[in-house]
């Protein structure tokens, strides 16, 4: 809002927050693919989806968990939980995205 008030318009998604699955390379962020051998990996590449969202003015607020190598909900940090029932996993390679969306 402050930027818009100053006349700074970043694009059609200006200021819209989003989270990106931890399969996509983003400068300055680890891209772990949820797998222990890659937990410290910083890739020199930048994912096209990130570039396009950034160019449209969207704001990255989180890298979201994915199961190891995009398989299931278990990653090197544990198991991604269902925010409505912590005894359950969120399931699937989009477990982090699903949990974040369900949690609001």
Predicted feature locations:
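Gly/Ser-rich catalytic/binding loops embedded in alpha/beta enzyme cores
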Residues: 1-104
């Amino acid at each position: 809002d402050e930027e818009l008030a100053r006349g700074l318009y970043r694009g059609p998604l200006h200021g819209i927050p989003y989270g990106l699955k931890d399969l996509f390379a983003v400068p300055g962020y680890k891209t772990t693919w949820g797998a222990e051998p890659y937990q410290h990996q910083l890739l020199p590449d930048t994912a096209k989806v990130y570039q396009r969202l950034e160019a449209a003015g969207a704001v990255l607020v989180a890298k979201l968990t994915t199961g190891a190598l995009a398989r299931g909900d278990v990653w090197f940090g544990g198991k991604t939980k269902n925010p409505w029932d912590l005894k359950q996993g969120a399931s699937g390679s989009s477990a982090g995205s699903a949990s974040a969306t369900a949690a609001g």
